[in-house]
């Protein structure tokens, strides 16, 4: 029920298996990037990065971006090329939303909904995008990492 009012779902990598992609794509308009734990099966379905402008807001998503304001070379090149308003990344599995003053963008890591990683609470982010603005940003907590339900 958490995704019922969503028009688009983005997954920032470490999918794990094709069944997760199938379930998301069957339920919603979904885009994703592969993560470092994802094998060839996932890497042939999802790209390394996604850039999309939605309602006038430019989003860049890549699994491993590096530390905020000190991104890795690949991410810096993508930021330079696309000039995103928002950088969505995964990898750490730790929820973080912070304004990046150096690169003039919003850095977002939604955390992780799965049970693998360093996170203690399973999380994801929801937001509205309309007329060039983001609004109603919510960090949704799904319970402790050992809890397996996601309705």
Predicted regions and their residues:
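Short, solvent-exposed aromatic-acidic interface loops
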Residues: 137-149
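Conserved beta-sheet core of the metallophosphoesterase superfamily
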Residues: 31, 70-133, 137
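Divalent metal-coordination and catalytic microenvironments
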Residues: 9, 14, 24, 35, ...
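N-terminal active-site segment of His-dependent metallophosphoesterases
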Residues: 1-30, 38-56, 120-123, 149-151
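Active-site donor-binding loop signature of nucleotide-sugar glycosyltransferases
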Residues: 54, 64, 110-112, 129, ...
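Acidic, His/Gly-enriched loop-helix segments that form or flank divalent-metal centers
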Residues: 23-26, 37-103
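Glycine-/small-residue-rich active-site loops that bind phosphorylated ligands and cofactors
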Residues: 16, 67, 115
């Amino acid at each position: 029920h958490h995704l019922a009012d969503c028009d688009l779902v983005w997954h920032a990598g470490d999918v794990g298996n094709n069944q997760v992609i199938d379930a998301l794509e069957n339920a919603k308009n979904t885009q994703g990037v592969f993560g470092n734990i994802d094998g060839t099966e996932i890497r042939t379905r999802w790209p390394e990065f996604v850039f999309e402008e939605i309602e006038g807001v430019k989003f860049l998503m890549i699994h491993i971006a590096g530390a905020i304001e000190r991104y890795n070379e690949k991410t810096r090149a993508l930021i330079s090329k696309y000039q995103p308003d928002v950088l969505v990344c995964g990898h750490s599995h730790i929820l973080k939303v912070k304004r990046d003053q150096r690169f003039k963008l919003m850095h977002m890591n939604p955390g992780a909904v799965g049970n693998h990683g360093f996170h203690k609470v399973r999380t994801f982010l929801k937001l509205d995008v309309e007329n060039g603005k983001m609004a109603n940003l919510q960090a949704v907590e799904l319970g402790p990492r050992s809890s397996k339900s996601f309705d």
